[in-house]
Swiss-Prot record:
Pfam families: TIM. Homodimer. It comes from the Bacteria. This is Triosephosphate isomerase. It is found in: Cytoplasm. Pathway: Carbohydrate biosynthesis; gluconeogenesis; Carbohydrate degradation; glycolysis; D-glyceraldehyde 3-phosphate from glycerone phosphate: step 1/1. GO terms for biological process: gluconeogenesis; glyceraldehyde-3-phosphate biosynthetic process; glycerol catabolic process; glycolytic process.
C-alpha cells in the first residue's frame, strides 16, 4: 500500500513572516506521518527558518529546485549539500515552469535527480504535457520521453523511493483541472512507462502525484483513483485552512 503524499508548492509567494506563521499553525495539526506524508516546498530563502520551525513534527519541508553540483562557481544556485544541511526532505525537480521559463531539459533534470539521491534528498520529479501536445495526440510520446529520460540510469531502489508528479501544464494555475478519469489514465500511463523501464516492483512502489488546480473540493475524487497517490498543490497550499482541508480529505 503506497502512502499518500500531499506537497504544497508555494512557488514565488508569501513573505518570511507569512511562511513561518503558516508552519507554526500547521505543524501540530497535520495528520500523523504514518497516515500521510505532508510537505510544503518553499522559496529557498525561507528554508532554514521553516526547517527550524517544524523540526520534530510531521510537517516536512521541501525545496523547489537545486543545482546538480555540490559546490563551485555557479552564481545564484543552491546545492544539494546546502539543502541537506538545512534539514530539507524533498526537492521538486523539472517543474513545468522550470522547463518553460528556464529551459531545463530532461537530461539536466536527470542529473539533478541523481545528485539529490546522492545527498539523501527525496526528488519529486515533474512530468506533463501542454494543451497543444495533448490536443495534437502527443500525450503518450511526450510523457514517455520525459519520464524515461528524467529517470534514466536510476536504480530500482531509487525509483521506488522517489515521487513523480504528473502535472498537465494546461491545468496549472488556470482554474482548469483534468477530470478524475483523465488524471487516473495519465498517472497510470506514467506508472506503465516506469514498469517498462524498471519493472513491475518499482512501478508498484513509486508514488505518483497529480498536480493541476487541486483544491479541497476536488481532491477526494482524485485520491480515490488507484494510480494517484497524492497531489502537488499550488494555490490551495498557500493558506493554512485550505492546506489542512487537503490533508483532512485523505
Amino acid at each position: 500500500m503506497r502512502k499518500p503524499i500531499i506537497a504544497g508548492n508555494w512557488k514565488m509567494n508569501l513573505t518570511l513572516k507569512d511562511a513561518v506563521a503558516f508552519a507554526e499553525e500547521v505543524k501540530g495539526t497535520v495528520p500523523a506521518s504514518s497516515k500521510v506524508d505532508a510537505a510544503v516546498c518553499a522559496p529557498s530563502v525561507f528554508l532554514a527558518h521553516l526547517t527550524e520551525a517544524t523540526a520534530g513534527t510531521d510537517l516536512k519541508i521541501g525545496a523547489q529546485n537545486m543545482y546538480d553540483q555540490e559546490s563551485g562557481a555557479f552564481t545564484g544556485e543552491i546545492s544539494p549539500v546546502m539543502l541537506k544541511e538545512l534539514g530539507v526532505t524533498y526537492v521538486v525537480l523539472g517543474h513545468s515552469e522550470r522547463r518553460e521559463y528556464f529551459g531545463e531539459t530532461d537530461a539536466f533534470i536527470n542529473s539533478k535527480t541523481k545528485k539529490a539521491f546522492e545527498h539523501g534528498l527525496v526528488p519529486i520529479v515533474c512530468v506533463g504535457e501542454t494543451l497543444e501536445e495533448r490536443e495534437g495526440g502527443k500525450f503518450e510520446s511526450v510523457i514517455r520521453e520525459q519520464t524515461t529520460n528524467s529517470l534514466k540510469g536510476l536504480t530500482v531502489d531509487q525509483v521506488k523511493n522517489l515521487v513523480v508528479a504528473y502535472e498537465p501544464v494546461w491545468a496549472i494555475g488556470t482554474g482548469k483541472s483534468a477530470t478524475e478519469q483523465d488524471a487516473q489514465d495519465s498517472c497510470k500511463f506514467v506508472r506503465d512507462v516506469i514498469a517498462a523501464e524498471f519493472g513491475t516492483e518499482a512501478a508498484e512502489a513509486v508514488r505518483i502525484q497529480y498536480g493541476g488546480s487541486v483544491k479541497p473540493d476536488n481532491i477526494k475524487e482524485y485520491m480515490a483513483q488507484p494510480d494517484i497517490d497524492g497531489a502537488l498543490v499550488g494555490g490551495a497550499s498557500l493558506e493554512t485552512g485550505s492546506f489542512l482541508k487537503l490533508l483532512e480529505a485523505i
